Amino acid sequence: MSADNEDYYDEDPYGFEEENAPITAEDTWAVISAFFREKGLVSQQLDSFNQFVDYTLQDIISEDSTLILEQLAQHTTEQDNISRKYEISFGKIYVTKPMVNESDGVTHALYPQEARLRNLTYSSGLFVDVTKRTYEAVDVPGRDLNYQLIAEESEEDSESGKVFIGRLPIMLRSKNCYLSDATESDLYKLKECPFDMGGYFIINGSEKVLIAQERSAGNIVQVFKKAAPSPISHVAEIRSALEKGSRFISTLQVKLYGRESSSARTIKATLPYIKQDIPIVIIFRALGIIPDGEILEHICYDVNDWQMLEMLKPCVEDGFVIQDRETALDFIGRRGTALGIKKEKRIQYAKDILQKEFLPHITQLEGFESRKAFFLGYMINRLLLCALDRKDQDDRDHFGKKRLDLAGPLLAQLFKTLFRKLTKDIFRYMQRTVEEANDFNMKLAINAKTITSGLKYALATGNWGEQKKAMSSRAGVSQVLNRYTYSSTLSHLRRTNTPIGRDGKLAKPRQLHNTHWGLVCPAETPEGQACGLVKNLSLMSCISVGADPMPIITFLSEWGMEPLEDYVPHQSPDATRVFVNGVWHGVHRNPARLMETLRTLRRKGDINPEVSMIRDIREQELKIFTDAGRVYRPLFIVEDDEELGRKELKVRKGHVAKLMATEYQDIEGGFEDAEDYTWSSLLNEGLVEYIDAEEEESILIAMQPEDLEPTAVEQDIPKENVDLAKRIKVTHHATTFTHCEIHPSMILGVAASIIPFPDHNQSPRNTYQSAMGKQAMGVFLTNYNFRMDTMANILYYPQKPLGTTRAMEYLKFRELPAGQNAIVAIACYSGYNQEDSMIMNQSSIDRGLFRSLFFRSYMDQEKKYGMSITETFEKPQRTNTLRMKHGTYDKLDEDGLIAPGVRVSGEDIIIGKTTPIAPDEEELGQRTAYHSKRDASTPLRSTENGIVDQVLITTNQDGLKFVKVRVRTTKVPQIGDKFASRHGQKGTIGITYRREDMPFTAEGIVPDLIINPHAIPSRMTVAHLIECLLSKVAALSGNEGDASPFTDITVEGISKLLREHGYQSRGFEVMYNGHTGKKLMAQIFFGPTYYQRLRHMVDDKIHARARGPMQVLTRQPVEGRSRDGGLRFGEMERDCMIAHGAAAFLKERLMEASDAFRVHICGICGLMSVIAKLNHNQFECKGCDNKIDIYQIHIPYAAKLLFQELMAMNITPRLYTDRSRDF
C-alpha cells in the first residue's frame, strides 16, 4: 500500500484498522450505496427486458421452429408417384442495434433523442436464420413413405439465410440500447441527460412504460373454504402453467362435497374438457393405481391417521363400481365434450386429457402417471387437512403467492402470439405456392409487418393483445411516462398494477398485507378507485427474472432425493417432500442438511442468488422457487460468531472499507490498486442474501445491527444509564436471529422517501404527499432545453431541501430538486389564510420565489391524401383559402412557420398549413372560383400566451415535412396558485402582502409564507414542525439536516442544538405586526420549511362565458374551458332552485340562457306540423286542414328534439295549450 493510501486511511473517521469490528448504522448506508450503484432504481425493468432479448426470444422461436407441408402424390398419371415434403425451419435469432429506415431507402443508426424529436420508434431489426428444405419420396402403395432430401446442388431447393421478420422496440439503457455503455461525455454529445435512468420505450416519439402486472402465481396448491349455501365445503385448486412457453393455463379443482354435518362427504375433481366432476378414486384408477390400499397411501401418508382415512371412506365406496383402468378411462371419456364415439376413441381421449391437460406443469409426456397420482394425492391431503381444521385455509392476498409480470413476460406473451400468426401466414403461403406450383419466395412469405405493427400497437395503446381482440385484452399496460418531476418519473417506472375491476367493492385485495413489508411501499398508492390496487415497489426491492430449475433438480437427485416414482409413504413417514416451482420431484430423509447445503451454495453464488428456498418444518416440505416475477429484497445475513459466542452480522468494517474504497475510486479516480469490491462481491461472499415474501416467513429478522448486541438487562447496566428518550428500543431475541434489515427506511418507495420524518406523520398524510410530490415543479431532466415535450414546467430557482433524507441521494433529489426552502411563520395574520390558504410575501415573489417556466409544444405534419394531394406549410392568403381561423396570421413567415422570439397570444396562428381542395368539391356553397385551398393551420391555445421558444423542422419516417413549435411562458405565483409542504399540507395563496406589510422578527427577518395554525392539530403532521426546527438548525449551522425515518434523532436533540445557536429551543420567535409595528401578543413558530409549487395554477383553470359556441345537435352551450363552453346548471342546482321556489329564475337558467326555441303547434292534432310563412303571416297544418287554430310556443330546443325523436319511434307526443283545450 503506497503512502498516500495510508494517509487516506489515517484521516478516516471510521477506524478501518479494526477490520473485524461490527458495523455501525452509518456503515449500512455504504452498503446501500453499493446496492444502488450496481442496480440503479429501474434494474427490474432492464433485467427483465435483457432476459427477454437474450433468452426468451430464442426460446419462443425454437418452440415453433419447424413448419412441414406434405404434398402427397396425385397419381393423375402413371409417372406421377412422387410425394414431396416441404420443410421450413427457424434457427438462431439476431437482434441489431436500433436503426431507422428512411423514406429514401437509407438505413442508419437511430439514437433516442432523434427518435423523440422526429416521432420515430426506437426499435431494432429481428433477423432469423431460415432454412427451407424439400424432400421427395416415391409413393409405393402399401408402404410407408421414405423421404430423401433432394440433392443440395440445386440452390433453389434448399435456401437458408438471415431473414428480416420484424422490428422490436428497444428499452432505453438495456443491453441493446446505445446508451447502455455510454460515458457521461457521450451522453452529453447525444443530448441525453445523465440522470435519465432508462427502462422505457420510445414509440412514435412518445415515451412508454410497461407497468408491472400482478397476478396469482401458477403451480401452487391453494385450499379455500366455501360459504354456506354452496354444496361444496372446501376446494383445493391449482392453476398449472407451463414453465416456459405458452402461458397456457389449466385449472384443476378438487372439491369436498357435503357440509360438515352431512354423512357422505365425497371428493370429486373437475378435469379440463370434462363436463362432470369425477370421483377421485376413478381418476386414480385411470392413472393406473388400482387397489384401494395404494390409492389411500397416495393420499394419506400416515397409516394411523384414522380421521383422514375415515373421511376417505365414502370416496372409496363412490368408486367401488369401477375396478380397472380401462373402465375408469372410459368413465372419464364418456363425460367428455365429443359425443357418440367408439370405446377405443373414448379411452384414447381420456388418456390424452390425463396426459396433456391434467396437471400439465408436472409433465405433458406419457409414462409419468405415478407422479401425477402422487400430486393429486397431495392435493387431496391438503384439502382434508383443511377440512379437519388442522390447517387454515390459504390466504389469497399473500404476497409470496403473487407474481409480477414485467416487460419481459409481457413482451414474450405478445411476441409468441404474433410469431404464431406469422408462421401461420407462412404456412398458408406455402400451401398456395404448392397448389399453384409457383416458386416459393421467402421475401413474400414472411410479412414483417405482423410483428412490427403488433408490438408497436400494444405499446402505443396499452391494449395488451391483438388489435382485433382489443376488447378482451388488458388495457393500460403501457402508459405514457410521467415527466413532470424527476421523482414522478422514477416512481412511474416502479409502479405495479393489479388487474381487478376497479369498481369491485372487495376491500381485501386493497389492504396492506403483512407480507408486503419491505417489498411494497406502505404509503405510496393513489386515493380513490385504484387505492391499494396500484402499488409502488420499495426502494430496495427487485423482481426475479427467472432461472433454469434443471441444475437444481439434478443437484437434488445427486444429493439423496428419492424420486417420487420410488416413494413408498409407509416406509418413510418422516421424509420431507421436495417441490421445485410447484412440481413435487421427490422426498428427502435429511432435510436440515440438504437445506444447509443449498443455502451455502446460494451464498457462494453457485445457485442463482434470486432462487428462494423455504423449508416448512411443520408441514415437512421443502419448496424451491426459481420462476420469474417474485419480488425479493436483500438482507444482511446473521450467523453465530465463535469469538463472541453470540449471533453477529457477517458484514464487517473491513468489507465496508473495501466498498467505500471502490466508491472513492469511482468518484475521484482514487488509488488504482484497490480491488473492485461491489454489491456482487457482498452477495457472492455470503454477506447479504436475497429473500422473497415466501422465504421471509421461515427466517427471523433483526431490525437493526444493534438489536444483536446483548441487551442492557443481560449486561447489568445500571438503570440510570439507559436512555429512556431513545426512540428505538432494543429487543430481547438476540439468540435466534438469522437475518437483519439493511435499514428500516428501505420499506418506503420513491415518493415516500422524499418525506422528512415520515415516521412522525399520521399515515394518510404520507399517502397524500406521495401523490402530491409527483405534481411538484422542479427540473425533470437536465436536457429539458433539447426536448419538445407536450408540456413541461421548470422551476426558476430550485433548491435542495435543508431537511434531507439519506435515500434522496439515490433519487438524485439534491441534483434535480422540486421545491424551495421558504421561511414560514405559523400564525393567524389578517385572516387571509383561513381554510388552508396562505399569505405569501409579494416582495419575495418579485425576487423570483417559486417562479417557473412553462413550455408547451405544438406539432403538425404535411399529410398525404392519396397519391397527388399533399398539404403544404405556407402562409394562407384570404384570397384563395377557405375557412380561415379568427386568429392573426401576421406573425407567420412565408414558409408558414413562426420565428423564435416572437410574442404570441391566444388564438394567434403559429403553424400555417393548407390543404388543396379537389376541383369538384362544393364546400357548403362558400366556395368561389378563386378558392383552391382549405386552411388547416394550428392556433395557439385560446387561454395561453407566451414567446415562441424553439421551432424544429424535420421529416418523419415517411419523408413528409414535420414541424414542432415550442412556446415558453413565465408563470409567476399569484392568488389561487397551489403549494404544499412535504407532509400533505396543501394550500393556495389567499393574498400576497408586500414586505412592509408582513410581520417581522426582532432580527428583522420577514417570512415568505404565513400558514394558519389550524392546519396542524387535527392533521397531526408533527413532522412538519420537526422539519421546520431541523431546517432552522441546518440554516444556522450550515449543514444539511438529516430527517431520515427510523433514526435516533429526537426533537429533544434538535432543540438543544437550536438553543446553542442562541434561539428559543422550540423555534418560537417574538414578531411585530407589519401594519402597526406593535409586538404580536403570541410567540410565533418560525423557520424554513421546504415547499413545493404544484401544477394546479389558477390561470389554467379560470373560466367564464357570456355567449359562445353551441352544440349542433341540441343547440345548448358546448362544454369545457378549451372550447369556451358554458357552466352547467346541473340537477342538484335545479333542485335547490325548486326548493327556494324561484321558478322564474329556474326557467331563465334552463331555457332562456340555454336553448329557448319557438315552434308553432296545431291546436287540433297537437303536433309541430305547422307550415309557418312568417313574412306573410300565414300558418297552416296540412294534415288537419287547419289555418286558424295555431299556437306559437317557446320550449327548449332539446325538448323539441326529444319530441321529434319520439315521433321517429312511432310515439306521438301532442302539445296542447290551455287555450286549445277550451276549443
Curated annotation (Swiss-Prot):
Entry-linked CDD domains: RNA_pol_B_RPB2
Localization, UniProt: Nucleus
Residues binding Zn(2+): C1162, C1165, C1181, C1184
Gene field: RPB2
EC number: 2.7.7.6
Subunit structure of this chain's protein: Component of the RNA polymerase II (Pol II) complex consisting of 12 subunits.
Protein source organism: Candida glabrata (strain ATCC 2001 / BCRC 20586 / JCM 3761 / NBRC 0622 / NRRL Y-65 / CBS 138)
One matching Pfam family: RNA_pol_Rpb2_1
GO BP annotation list: siRNA-mediated pericentric heterochromatin formation; transcription elongation by RNA polymerase II; transcription initiation at RNA polymerase II promoter
Superkingdom: Eukaryota
General function of this protein: DNA-dependent RNA polymerase catalyzes the transcription of DNA into RNA using the four ribonucleoside triphosphates as substrates. Second largest component of RNA polymerase II which synthesizes mRNA precursors and many functional non-coding RNAs. Proposed to contribute to the polymerase catalytic activity and forms the polymerase active center together with the largest subunit. Pol II is the central component of the basal RNA polymerase II transcription machinery. It is composed of mobile elements that move relative to each other.
Zinc finger C4-type: from-to: 1162-1184
Enzyme class: transferase
Alphabetized NCBIfam families for the sequence: PRK09606.1
Family assignment from sequence similarity: Belongs to the RNA polymerase beta chain family.
Keywords annotated in UniProt: DNA-directed RNA polymerase, Magnesium, Metal-binding, Nucleotidyltransferase, Nucleus, Transcription, Transferase, Zinc, Zinc-finger
Catalytic activity, as annotated: RNA(n) + a ribonucleoside 5'-triphosphate = RNA(n+1) + diphosphate
UniProt-annotated stretches for the region Disordered: 1-20
Cellular component GO terms, alphabetical: mitochondrion; pericentric heterochromatin; RNA polymerase II, core complex
GO MF annotation terms: DNA binding; DNA-directed RNA polymerase activity; ribonucleoside binding; RNA binding; RNA-directed RNA polymerase activity; zinc ion binding
InterPro entries for this protein: DNA-dir_RNA_pol_su2, DNA-dir_RNAP_su2_dom, DNA-dir_RNAP_su2_hyb_sf, RNA_pol_bsu_CS, RNA_pol_bsu_protrusion, RNA_pol_Rpb2_2, RNA_pol_Rpb2_2_sf, RNA_pol_Rpb2_3
Note: The binding of ribonucleoside triphosphate to the RNA polymerase II transcribing complex probably involves a two-step mechanism. The initial binding seems to occur at the entry (E) site and involves a magnesium ion coordinated by three conserved aspartate residues of the two largest RNA Pol II subunits.
Protein name: DNA-directed RNA polymerase II subunit RPB2
Binding sites annotated in the UniProt record for Mg(2+): D836
PROSITE patterns: RNA_POL_BETA
Keyword Nucleus set for record: yes
